[in-house]
């Protein structure tokens, strides 16, 4: 079982929200109110993500809420897979490729972290090729 620090946890949650914001950047609408709502949501997620990564020490999940957190994380995985499937994407294959790429960041089997505990790209890093899965 890993032993992450509180900073590691809030940084990881911030990174997760950053990825949700990134997904929303490709969501377009011809309705100006919908476009504004998307832009506002992206801005809010980016702000929260940045704050969690920099100042997350006062943010936490209560022990009694851990089951609810796990349920929400699982639901996010299921719904994210569903979105990709609806677009005809091979999400499990793409996930394997992204994992391969992420592990190529490691040096001697270990991640390299920056001062914010973000995993950095090592010298043997290769980006994921998602083309076959779209």
Residue ranges and their predicted role:
Residues 1-73, 77-134:
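Flexible "arm" and connector segments at domain edges
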